[in-house]
Amino acid sequence: MPVVEETYDIVVVGAGHAGCEAALAAARLGFETIMFTVSVDSIALMPCNPNVGGSSKGHLVRELDALGGEMGKNIDKTFIQSKMLNESKGPAVHSLRAQADKQEYTRSMHRVLENTDHLTIRQAEVAEILTEEIPGEYGTFQEEHEGHQESGYPVKKRIVGVKTYSGAVYKCRAVVLATGVYL
């Protein structure tokens, strides 16, 4: 099978909540971005807990919203019920929690991603992060010791791309790993 080689600025591995937000942020800044997922049907999947909000996650969602993130907007479009938590306590600890229609949440996020300029979605599993050595201030001193190579100084490397299990190579300047619980 021939090796496909494409070039992007940013590669995002994973399409859960964090991967979606990372890919959207990069693409909205004008970086050519590709997001890998093992299944396009599982983009922004909520397999267990369909809630967004609460005292901890709610704070994070508000921070994302302030930075232009999509999670808060998406839950606003797809929630089936919401509840204010900790109402018997002081206003500082009140927090909103919304329960999403799990399938609609996934479909809605998928639509947003598909309609974002500079963003490509690819169904593939990344097998390897590709790097290359870069000469540091002192170079990359190597010596042979008792039959094997040893570095005299730390070898500096930079990311140059990723390789999928099918052998396709995607060159890039940076990789964001957002594999969640599936690493």
Each model region followed by its residue ranges:
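N-terminal amphipathic, basic-rich helices that act as targeting or association modules
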Residues: 20-22
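Short hydrophobic core segments
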Residues: 11-13, 169-179
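A ubiquitous, low-specificity "background" feature that marks scattered single residues
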Residues: 15, 27, 55, 139, ...
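Conserved beta-strand-loop-beta-strand element in the redox core of flavoprotein oxidoreductases
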Residues: 130-168
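Beta1/beta-strand and adjacent pyrophosphate-binding region of the FAD-binding site
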Residues: 4-18
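Conserved N-terminal/central alpha/beta ligand/cofactor-binding core
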Residues: 3-7, 24-134, 166, 178-183
